[in-house]
Amino acid sequence: MLKPKNVIDREDKGEIVEAEGGGTMTKVYCTAIVLAAGSGKRMGTKVHKQYLQLCEKPVLAYSLQAFQQSDLIDEIILVVGKGEEEFCRTEIVEKYGFFKVQKIICGGEQRYHSVWNGLKETKAGYVYIHDGARPFVNENIIRRGYECVVREHACAAGMPVKDTVKIVDDNNIVSQTPERKYVWIV
């Protein structure tokens, strides 16, 4: 979650919300940028990951649903691949009633281009950036992220790796094995 330099508490979005563990906090306008412009080449399927069916629903719909249902999220900006805008509008956004999706925009050549395209469309406030092919985001993650940003001004959701990770040099020779306790995936 990013905090742009022009963060303001909007008059119409300054409601008080409960904080985890008790207490309250003033709600700042929040935008979720959901990235769904990837082609999933590494996966090797004909259908992009975000559109694969999971329990009869596209994977992307689960990500959108979590942000749609969160009282912390005011709007969603959906970033999709070129030419997929209308498909996403009709087959996902309208079909599943994701009314918080305010804009469907085209992604860029690389992930960071897609993020930048989304950021250019946001209003002032806090911004969540989420990979639409990761369907297991939930209210707890969203709320904890919000609380972390209020305290620390930036945050990334992640978890420790379970696998052994190796660092290689330019010749693909293992040069290091970092301790797992220092390696997280985000």
What does each model-identified segment do?
Residues K27-E85:
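N-terminal glycine-rich phosphate-binding loop and ensuing alpha1 helix
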Residues V34, L60, G118, H130-D131, ...:
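Residue-level signal for inorganic ion chemistry
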Residues E86-I92:
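Acidic helix N-cap motif at the loop->helix transition within catalytic regions
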Residues R111-V115:
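Conserved donor sugar-nucleotide recognition element shared by glycan-biosynthetic enzymes
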Residues W116-Y126:
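Active-site nucleotide-sugar/metal-binding loop of Leloir-type enzymes
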Residues G125-A133:
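Short beta-strand-to-loop acidic/aromatic patch adjacent to the donor-nucleotide binding site
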